[in-house]
């Protein structure tokens, strides 16, 4: 895989972020335990990638010191990433393209997260990339991290490839590494999946870089 996330153009972990609301483990949601078929060979041309801009609609996500909301940072970053991947020949889907709840307003955590994963699974995606911004009660904490859940054999590989390209983007406090996370969207996606934490919105400098 080679997936480039250029956050500068858009603009351990204290908090494995709560994606939507904290769901209980679900049953009956499409996309359990790596049953899908996906391609890891070759370049990006012809690959199917689903991008998930975190939060949206009734869920603002984390909020920075100036009031900047996570949902308003993840969407333009995701749109930029979509364009960059398409320019390299990938077919890209997004779980949302506007400021909306994916399942519907004020959905339960399981419904909202399940709706996002189901989009990736329905398109038989080769990779799922969820974009988020971290937050912590210490405003000096910062940096970029990538989470994975080892279910397909390629999740950690994808996380490492992406993290190595984005870890030292100017304006952010460096490399927080890859970390395994028992997160719903990573567990329930059929394909290799990562969740990228592009800095800390609680850090004034990083909030500024995200705008």
PLM features: residue spans?
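A generic structural signal for short coil/turn motifs at secondary-structure boundaries
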Residues: 9, 45, 61, 205-206
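Active-site-adjacent mobile loop/cap segments within catalytic or ligand-binding domains
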Residues: 130, 135-137, 174-211
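Catalytic-core regions of hydrolytic enzymes
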Residues: 20-160, 168
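Proline/glycine-rich low-complexity loops and linkers
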Residues: 161-176
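Non-catalytic surface loops within mature trypsin-like serine protease
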Residues: 9-11, 150, 200-202
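Surface-exposed edge beta-strands and adjoining flexible/disordered loops or tails in beta-rich
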Residues: 1-25
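Envelope-exposed proteins and targeting segments
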Residues: 1-3, 45-49, 88-90, 125, ...
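Short glycine-/small-residue-rich flexible loop motifs, especially phosphate/cofactor-binding loops
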Residues: 82, 117, 163, 183, ...
